[in-house]
Regions:
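Single, function-defining residue in the core of a domain
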Residues: 1-61, 65-66, 92-94, 101-105, ...
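Phosphate-interacting basic helix/loop segments used at nucleotide- and nucleic-acid interfaces
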Residues: 116-119
Length: 409
């Protein structure tokens, strides 16, 4: 079966998911419209989205290709191809807050037209089925930059990097909060910002890098449940056994912190669980802590195991979108590229959800990238891809999440 033809190019069909008046509206809000002359804000966003879809390696790559398809561009909301200098200047000087605002506005729009997209966007394979609450997975990822970014993103002695702190909704496998900063921002310091929008009754799961007992106590007061790993130097006193050891659960106890400062920061009791967990094919003892005193110890272990979903999320972005070669060196240009990468991701995820795509995200990306300028119905293209035989690979596994130049934690 061949894909059916369409009067629009695949690129136009993807870009059409962004509301027509949204980009001009945000350009006025952030003052970008005053900076635009021949290269409109819409043309700027389209060029960056195309750079993500084509996995472009640089400014010339994007500019040359867009000039070669100038006729098709004019049909996409009268956008125009940029000059190299004009594109570079726009990335460097136009307020990147517009790109961030655009991402959240488009995500909100997609949620409004299809509410089930956000609540059931994609069921992660390791999602603990016994939990009906919202599960928020929190982590950060370091994005390596070139040495030219040292003036604003110095990371260690001779390296530059940005860091993306992200809160992932495990029901939909979509981000619910993102903050992009230089890599010297410590995870624990960003924890309050990342968790600010979490509601009472929801669950937060994060690595021990985010452990700040002042913040953990604030979450307890707010009615938020949390699960994390215990640091090796945590001082505590066992108050009693919570439940008997069973299977991979070595110890389940109720404790009270005894550190000079931590006992003041977190005056209530909490749960400490020692368990054997499989890591990279080997059994390893891990220690978890939580403020929930009712769940089974195995459920708390399952919740932390679900945290590895965020590594799969970072892997999907790294393997498909362009977060290795950047189109500019200053902070503004880097932020434009990161936010348009996330924008492209949610557009493709929405297409995957609408088409009931059952293969990997990477295959969806490559299927559409190959016909980006063709006048084919993109859903028909994906339907044809789905006719191939063989075992369907649903999505990446956490143990495969090795990201060159994109370190998690």
């Amino acid at each position: 079966m061949n894909p059916s033809k369409h009067k629009m190019s695949v690129l136009k069909q993807i870009f059409k998911l962004i509301p027509r008046n949204l980009i001009p509206k945000l350009a006025r809000k952030h003052g970008v419209d005053k900076q635009a002359r021949s290269f409109s804000p819409g043309s700027h966003v389209l060029a960056l989205v195309f750079g993500q879809l084509s996995h472009a390696l640089g400014l010339n790559d994007i500019c040359d290709t867009l000039w070669n398809h100038k006729g098709v561009l004019t049909t996409i909301r009268e956008t125009t191809p940029p000059s190299r200098n004009g594109f570079s200047h726009a990335n460097r000087t136009r307020n990147a807050d517009m790109a961030e605002d655009l991402f959240w506005s488009v995500l909100g729009h997609l949620k409004s037209i299809s509410p089930r997209f956000y609540s059931q966007g994609r069921n992660y394979c390791a999602m603990p089925r016994k939990f009906k609450r919202v599960i928020n997975v929190i982590d950060s990822s370091t994005i390596q930059l070139v040495a030219n970014c040292m003036d604003w993103a110095k990371h260690r002695r001779r390296k530059a990097a940005a860091k993306m702190h992200l809160r992932l909704d495990l029901r939909s496998f979509l981000p619910s909060f993102v903050v992009v900063k230089s890599a010297d921002s410590h995870d624990a310091k960003e924890a309050r910002t990342v968790c600010a929008g979490v509601n009472s009754g929801e669950i937060c799961v994060f690595d021990k890098a985010y452990v700040d007992f002042k913040h953990l106590y604030e979450l307890l007061v707010r009615g938020v449940f949390w699960v994390t790993r215990a640091k090796t130097n945590m001082k505590y006193e066992a108050m009693g056994q919570h439940s008997a050891a069973k299977g991979n659960i070595l110890r389940d106890e109720v404790i009270k912190l005894t550190g000079v400062r931590t006992s003041k920061w977190y005056p209530k009791i909490l749960r400490r669980i020692e368990a054997m967990a499989e890591v990279d094919g080997k059994m390893k003892k891990m220690v978890f802590i939580s403020n929930n005193l009712d769940w089974a110890a195995s459920s708390i272990c399952d919740l932390y195991k679900a945290r590895w979903a965020i590594e799969v999320f970072f892997k999907e972005i790294k393997q498909t979108l362009q977060l290795a070669d950047f189109m500019g060196y200053n902070e503004n240009a880097v932020r434009w590229q990161i936010w348009t990468a996330l924008l492209t991701y949610i557009l493709l995820r929405f297409i995957a959800w609408q088409s009931k795509w059952k293969h990997s995200f990477n295959r969806l990306f490559t299927a559409l990238r190959g016909v980006i300028w063709n006048g084919l119905d993109m859903y028909s293209v994906l339907e044809c891809c789905g006719t191939a035989g063989g075992k369907v690979r649903m999505r990446a596994a956490p143990e495969q999440a090795y990201l060159p130049g994109f370190n998690t934690g």
